[in-house]
Amino acid sequence: MSSTKQKLSFASDYMEGAHPEILRRLLETNMEQTAGYGLDAYSESARKKIRAACQADDAEIFFLIGGTQANAVVIDALLRSYQGVIAAETGHISVHEAGAIEFGGHKVLTLAHQTGKITAAQIESALAAYREDANREHMVMPGMVYLSQPTEYGALYSLAELEAISAVCRAADIPLYLDGARLAYALACPANDVTLADIARLADVFYIGGTKCGALFGEAVVFPKRNTVPHFFSIVKQHGALLAKSRIAGLQFDTLFTNHLYEKGGETAIFAADRIRSALREKDYPLAYDAPTNQIFLVLDDAQKARLSKQVEMGFWENLADGKTVMRIATSWATQDEDVDRLIALL
């Protein structure tokens, strides 16, 4: 994001291309001839680094293009035809994937949320309601649980919350899936107490987001235990999601997991977001949600919205009953200090 632009952009965290180090390595290796379909040395190097970061020596790792694709493939691979996936009513698979999960033949079973989070007690209650219903054989069976870290509202699951949810899932013998589209920003947040190793221990599958965290594209799907889904490679292919030139994704993750680049990108975003949050509070802008990560949800009246929108691109979130609007500001790995300075001056 260049400070010379007339209009600042804080609309989302995937507006830029990729971290310059990724582009440098892609250019350096451009004319190399490597094996396809993730069988190249760069993809294998990335897998080794991710296994080390997750403290999961037996993990199977696959590189897919984007988050919706990863969610659709993983969920379809883990569920039987008569099963659905439990998720928050605000979850990405519930509202922002154009029915991709339903298109694959599986119902999203939604639960009420608090800043995008659901609880172990809610999940346990939903599972019990199914078990105790005399007509359950005529109903969609809850077959897995979907969470995201951070949530759509920028909130974080604590380690205790994830441990409780994982325990419920394991007692019910259903998989827990964690969407990590913005995982770099969760890991870098001072309020976070969940590590990659914790996620690998508690979830049956998760993905490490690249698209929103410094890569041109790509998500790394991680199964901590080998053979969780037999022949997952073939399932990816069947969904049209297998990259022939998968080395391009593998190389990006190899770069992100070299010299802590993934963590540094998250830290850049959180530092910028914390500065903006502090300025908003100092200038008495109400915040709609207590979100400690890279997404900030501010409440604007019509005059404030019109004034700021002339110079700052923000994301619309929701209209409130009092006529005000919740707008989202998102920082990223690429946010520049001077752009934060300019935004604060405009408030």
Where are these regions (language model features)?
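Conserved N-terminal alpha-helix of the aminotransferase class I/II PLP-enzyme fold
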Residues: H19-G67, E89-S94, A100
